[in-house]
Structures are given as C-alpha cells and as structure tokens.
C-alpha cells in the first residue's frame, strides 16, 4: 500500500491585540474547506492555525486593561480557539507563540540559520506606527502620518537580526517560472514576481522588539 501524499496548510496566525474579527473567520473557513477537500482526495493533511501573542500593541492593551500581557493574550487566544471550535473547523494543531514548544523550536531554527549565515545582525530604522505595528519610509507617509490608519508615527531605530531573503531570489524566480501552479491564483503570482522578486528581494527583519 503506497503512502498517502502529504499536504500542509496553515492560516496566518491571528493577532491577539483584540477580539477576532470577520477577516480571521473568513480565512480559517477557506483553509478548512481546502483541508477537507484535500483529505477527500486521499491526502495526509496537516492543518495548522493559531495565535500571534507578541508585540508592543499587546503590551499597551494589557496595560489599559490593568492585567499582564500574558493574561491578556490568554483571554484573547482562548476566545479565538472557542470560536474556531464552535465552527467545527478541522485544524490538527492550534499553535500559540507563547507555547514552550513553539519557543523552543523557533530558537532551534533561528540558531541553525544564524550558524549557516542566513541570519545576520544589523539596524532597522524608519517611522513606526504603533497601532498598525508597521515601519514606513518618509516617502510612504501621507502628510507625515501613517498611510494605513492616518495616525501619527514616531521615528524608531534599533539593532535587529535580518534573514537573507535576497540570497534566495534567483532560486525562487526559477522555481516559480518552472512551476507556474506554485502560487495561486495567477494574480498573486504576478504580484509576487513584479512587486517583490524582479525589482530585487529585500532582506527581512526577523527580530524587532516593537
């Protein structure tokens, strides 16, 4: 008997600065539909979802609520998981970024990439919007404010670690060109190629404390 082909699917992990919204629900419903469809085709599916529980915005929200950040994310993550279970989504694992096992695996992978030279130390600098948790260049600002939410931004600079995505740009372009079904739908493939890969893929900051 041949081994079942494997299929891995994950959602973005929901941010725990507040209650879940329709966008989170929409995403997991779509992922659940794909997972169920692939199982019906005979695939060995592993479907993962979860919550992102780190960030300055969470710290500020916890302070406003008069509780610790851990207590705050515990409440939000529990509510998100309750809703996913209420909807009978068929995920195989619900990951929390505060889980001991998750932290252990992240450290293991980070060290492996650092030892390999794929992660290096540098500086990240820009105008930072706390509500959006995003950095912007001066040229991206609208009237000196965040282009996404319109709130004031603050200059920020800190030492950080970067992943050498630029090192893999040519390999990614070649793979996408030889496997046109790799990114779907086609509009997203074109967006990735034209907006990120072909102009020159930038290294990714992976350790901001903000």
Describe the residue ranges of each PLM region.
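A broadly conserved sequence feature marking short terminus-proximal activation segments
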Residues: 72-128
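Cys/His-rich short segments
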Residues: 116-173
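A short small-residue
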Residues: 12, 56-62, 89
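Short, solvent-exposed turn/loop segments enriched in Gly/Ser/Thr/Pro and often Arg
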Residues: 47-57, 97-102, 131
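A charged helix-plus-loop insertion that forms the helical arch/lid used to bind
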Residues: 61-74
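Structured secondary-structure scaffolds
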Residues: 2-49, 101-105, 158-210
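Short glycine/serine/threonine/alanine-rich loop segments
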Residues: 43-44, 67, 89, 118
């Amino acid at each position: 008997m041949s081994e079942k082909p494997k299929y891995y699917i994950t959602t973005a992990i929901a941010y725990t600065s507040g209650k879940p919204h329709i966008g989170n629900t929409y995403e997991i419903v779509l992922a659940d539909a794909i997972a169920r469809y692939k199982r019906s085709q005979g695939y060995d599916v592993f479907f993962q979802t979860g919550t992102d529980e780190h960030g300055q915005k969470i710290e500020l929200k916890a302070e406003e609520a008069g509780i610790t950040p851990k207590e705050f994310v515990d409440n939000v993550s529990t509510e998100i998981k309750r809703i996913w279970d209420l909807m009978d989504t068929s995920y195989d694992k619900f990951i929390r970024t505060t889980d001991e096992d998750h932290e252990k695996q992240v450290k293991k992978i980070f060290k492996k990439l650092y030892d390999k030279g794929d992660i290096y130390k540098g500086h990240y600098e820009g105008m930072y919007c706390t509500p959006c948790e995003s950095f912007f260049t001066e040229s991206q600002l609208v009237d000196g404010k965040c282009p996404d939410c319109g709130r004031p931004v603050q200059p920020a600079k800190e030492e950080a670690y970067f992943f050498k995505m630029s090192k893999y740009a040519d390999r990614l372009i070649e793979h996408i060109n030889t496997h046109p079904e790799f990114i779907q739908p086609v509009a997203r493939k074109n967006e990735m190629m034209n907006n990120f890969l072909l102009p020159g893929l930038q290294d990714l900051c992976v350790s901001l404390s903000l």
